């Protein structure tokens, strides 16, 4: 059950979202669905260049220029989970950016994580 709570004339009611199958395009990556039914896709914009990030290769170059390095987990219980992700860390902070290995699963949550940790370099936009 998902939706939006609407307050009108002193009454609060839940207006439910249509099921995912009602939206054209269905499910997936790229940050927001299939482009129809009112769902807006999101993209990560690198503000200094005005370039939209379209691959992990370009994202990794941009993050490296900001001091981020690939982080390779060193075994233990988290190794299996880390093998499913790309991770970046910055030596000057305790921050860690974790992204799914498959770029098609790169969504708005991951984009906003990058934006919060690099406020002057990235922005999430509607496409």
From Swiss-Prot:
Transmembrane segments: none annotated. One of its GO terms (biological process) is regulation of flower development. Residues 18-40 are annotated as: Disordered. Residues 24-38 have a biased composition (Gly residues). Belongs to the FPF1 family. This is Flowering-promoting factor 1-like protein 2. It comes from Oryza sativa subsp. japonica (Rice).
